[in-house]
Amino acid sequence: MTTLNLRKDAAPAPAFVSAAARFGVIEKPDLAFTPAVARETEHLYEKVKDFIPAFEWAAYAPYVHAINRLKKERNAVILAHNYQTPDIFHCVADIVGDSLQLARDATKVDAEIIIQCGVHFMAETSKLLNPEKTVLIPDARAGCSLSESITGADVRLLKERYPGVPVVTYVNTSADVKAETDICCTSSNVLAVVESLESDTVLCIPDEYLAMNVARETNKKILTWKGHCEVHERFTAAELLAYKEANPGIEIVGHPECHPDVIAVCDFSGSTSGMINYVKDKRPQRVLLVTECSMASNIQAEVKGVDFVKPCNLCPHMKRITLPKIFDSLLTMTEEVLVDPAIADRARLAVERMVNLKQ
């Protein structure tokens, strides 16, 4: 029970001070493509030259150069999801990975400021795990169809309908939903999370296909919710079979946010990091990644000799994050991510249970 202090002399809550006021605004530097900028970014261009023509690099390089300088000046770190474009992933990010990796690494950063290059729920997760740090997202409109498919009120109704059944919630959700959750999961650890619970029945929400895929790997009864990723739900088994017929010997690597019929056609399925590790370890001659198409470009820069067939399904939300917006974040300190204190502690607990789960 919470006891409210109603004394007239109670100290008022401290006034909110914006990140811009706390850290100050930096004047916009020159973004000319000078010989010095070309020279200092040359090693980074080597990583992305297969995706960015030399004449276009003249527009990218000044932002890359300025961002990497501003990070040091601001004591900031950039966390980037595997779906970010190669210029962000390879040229300005300090930490890259899937949702689980980013959540874990967010707890280890020493920097005062976190710039989250991903969608909004990822930035919220970083804030939950780092309540004392300043977390910025370059574009607060970077949402997620899965996150928008369910609310905290929906979860409360599910708990009323299935009393005593533990709730496993995908991290692709808002803090409001996480606050109603027993434990979070990602696509890389969902089976381990489900198996860690003593109950024979588990609510696995909101991604219906992820839940259906994990149901095939466990003896527990899995209850689902009809949320879907707008990128992965577009893939079909017929489409992948057509690729196989047209490309004999091709290996298909899928993401468990796809329909189970799609996963059944794949040679391997796993989280984005699992997919990356599979390609790096197996080095297939030709491979098709059944996921957001920027990831194939990001791996291709690191894995030579592998032919990537790219069915290009783009995430419009991830693509809201751009170099100019990252640059503006570091200059103006806007789009700060805050979590309502009324739900933050409960949401944090669900994420921490996942992060601390023994694998």
Swiss-Prot record:
One term under GO cellular component: cytosol
This protein's UniProt keywords: 4Fe-4S, Cytoplasm, Iron, Iron-sulfur, Metal-binding, Pyridine nucleotide biosynthesis, Transferase
Q: EC no.?
A: 2.5.1.72
One MF term in the entry's GO annotations: quinolinate synthetase A activity
> Which positions, given as ranges, span the membrane?
none
Q: Look up the record and name the pathway of this protein.
A: Cofactor biosynthesis; NAD(+) biosynthesis; quinolinate from iminoaspartate: step 1/1
Organism's domain of life?
A: Bacteria
User: Is this entry keyworded Hydrolase?
Assistant: no
Q: What's any GO biological process attached to this entry?
A: 'de novo' NAD biosynthetic process from L-aspartate
Annotated catalysed reactions: iminosuccinate + dihydroxyacetone phosphate = quinolinate + phosphate + 2 H2O + H(+)
Q: Which cofactor does it need?
A: [4Fe-4S] cluster
Q: Which positions are annotated as binding [4Fe-4S] cluster? A: 144, 229, 315
Q: Where in the cell is it found?
A: Cytoplasm
Residues binding iminosuccinate, per UniProt: 81, 99, 170-172, 187, 255-257, 272
What role does it play?
Answer: Catalyzes the condensation of iminoaspartate with dihydroxyacetone phosphate to form quinolinate.
Q: Which NCBIfam families match?
A: nadA, PRK09375.1-2, PRK09375.1-4
Q: Which PANTHER family match?
A: QUINOLINATE SYNTHASE, CHLOROPLASTIC, QUINOLINATE SYNTHETASE A
Q: What is the official name of this protein in its record?
A: Quinolinate synthase
* Native species: Sinorhizobium medicae (strain WSM419) (Ensifer medicae)
